[in-house]
Amino acid sequence: MTDLNSDIIHDTSYIIIDKLKSFPHQQTNLLDVRICGFDLDGTIITTSSGNTFPKNESDWKFMFDNVLQVLHNLYMSGHVIIIFTNQSKLEKSADNHILNRIIHILNALTSANIKFMCFIAKDKNHYRKPMTGMYDLCINSLMKKGMMKFSRAHSFFCGDALGRKKDFADSDLKFA
């Protein structure tokens, strides 16, 4: 497993994993940043076991065969890839398999030459979707990198918790 320790910022309420060391390949105007936000579970990945919750750190697969290609194409076209995920069981996991699972997934993105930032809400507070604490952290982090203005018209958020009958919540819809 790749060592991401130098890219991880731990806080009592959140974790930030920053693999966005450079701006998107074709980004010419750092003042007009296009953000592509994604939920993790049920959007980018799912369990390989078919269970609702993962059994271990290896229990995952990409939701669709073309996920890496789509993310890479978005990055190469100048979008900033951001993952926002609620992981309230992270601190309760005795063997930390939840964080290890996330690191496995993010290593797969890194191996595909996709630069991204991942914001993980650990507690049920203002960082947890649908609250906007993770988004605020994201904007502050991007501003520190020199990205000053965000094109909301050319940005989006994609998640699975939309409040439909089959959904467990509507937090992604409200977050978007």
Feature-to-residue mapping (PLM):
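Non-catalytic pre-domain segments flanking phosphatase-related domains
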Residues: 1-40
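Short, acidic loop-to-helix structural element flanking the phosphoryl-transfer center
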Residues: 23, 51-83, 90-111, 128-133
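Short helix-terminating capping/connector loops at secondary-structure junctions
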Residues: 29-31, 74-78, 113-115, 146-153
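Hydrophobic "anchor" residues
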Residues: 43-44
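Short coil/turn segments at secondary-structure boundaries
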Residues: 48-51, 95, 168-171
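Short histidine/acidic/glycine/proline-rich micro-motifs that form metal-
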Residues: 87-93, 122-126, 162-165
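A short, structured active-site edge motif that brings together acidic residues
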Residues: 109-128, 154-160
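Conserved Lys-Pro-Asp/Glu-containing loop-to-beta segment of HAD-superfamily phosphomonoesterases
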Residues: 131-170
